[in-house]
């Protein structure tokens, strides 16, 4: 599938940086709040608990982003899906859905693992009120298939992703909020995989093969 819009490398990099900063600004801000509480000399235990939980949250988000958006090694490198599972599990400890991962641990090309992690973010966006998000890895290391099934209240395919996936030119320019759906489809194109969407009243299934 050809994307209906093309971003320059400079714009893509800048927008992804904005997206990552948006993801970590909340836990980093909470760390700062905890430090201010300590400086004021009140509620030391509460302040330390806030600092610790926020630091773990920020670390989990950065570790996830390192693989999902970053180089994570040299060009052409393969990534262990076990590492992807670990960073995803830690990331979703701070999110609403119940998260499960099923599938054999294999080495896959970097762009395919990046695609998988970005599909998790799309799935998470489909259940804004929480629910469950289940990942299943099928096929082989040479011909993998990813299946992400989400269930929950207010199910809906994220509008920006649906718009870009349909092949229609977006009504508004790609910004820091819509760059992740764009990047997901770009990764699928680079990896030679096709993303399919199957939505019912009970669940939404995103698959790539």
UniProtKB/Swiss-Prot annotation:
Molecular function GO labels: protein homodimerization activity; protein kinase activity
Principal location class: cytoplasm
Uppermost EC category: transferase
UniProt cross-references to InterPro entries, sorted A to Z: ChpT_C (IPR018762), HATPase_C_sf (IPR036890)
Disruption phenotype: This gene cannot be deleted or disrupted in the absence of a complementary copy expressed in trans, indicating this gene is essential in B.abortus.
GO biological process per UniProt: peptidyl-aspartic acid modification; phosphorelay signal transduction system
Reported modifications of this chain: Is phosphorylated by CckA-P on His-22.
Keywords, in A-Z order: Cytoplasm, Kinase, Phosphoprotein, Transferase
Pfam family, one: HPTransfase
E.C. number: 2.7.99.-
A single Gene Ontology CC term: cytoplasm
Residues modified as Phosphohistidine: 22
Protein localization: Cytoplasm
Quaternary structure, from the entry: Homodimer. Forms an asymmetric heterotetramer with CtrA (2:2). There are at least two modes of interaction between ChpT and CtrA, only one of which is competent to catalyze His-Asp phosphoryl transfer.
Entry comment, domain topic: Each ChpT monomer is composed of an N-terminal dimerization and histidine phosphotransfer (DHp) domain and a C-terminal domain that is structurally similar to the catalytic and ATP-binding domain found in histidine kinases but that lacks regions required for ATP binding.
Function: Component of a regulatory phosphorelay system that controls B.abortus cell growth, division, and intracellular survival inside mammalian host cells. This signaling pathway is composed of CckA, ChpT, CtrA and CpdR. ChpT efficiently and specifically shuttles phosphoryl groups from the CckA kinase to the receiver domains of both CtrA and CpdR. Does not bind ATP. Overexpression of chpT results in a defect in cell morphology, DNA content, and intracellular survival in human macrophages.
Family: Belongs to the ChpT phosphotransferase family.
This protein's name: Protein phosphotransferase ChpT
Source species: Brucella abortus (strain 2308)
Primary gene name: chpT
